[in-house]
Amino acid sequence: MTAALDPAGIPVLPRGVRLHHDRVRGVEVLLGPERTLMLDGIGHAILSEVDGARSVAAISDDLAARFGAPRDRVGADVSEFLGDLAEKRLLDLQDG
């Protein structure tokens, strides 16, 4: 079980980790050192909002508004997804 992320924390992709479009498979992937994580549409939507400036809460607010979804549900999903990536060392969380 992933620990809840601080909503004020600012997610950033660490050095050597980046979003990439895999043209062969036609999917978005997260590339990290010696690993690749294929993303579904939701994962890509979340990671495309990670800019190193906005907090987890701000990203959740923007996604909830964009997709017309309940803020509490989106916030929980964003926190869980980013927390999983942080546990895998594919994401860092800076103090907000």
Q: Can you say where each PLM-predicted feature lies in the sequence?
A:
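Acidic, low-complexity/disordered tracts enriched in E/D and polar residues
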Residues: M1-S48, Q94-D95
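Long, charge-rich, low-complexity alpha-helical segments
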Residues: R35-G96
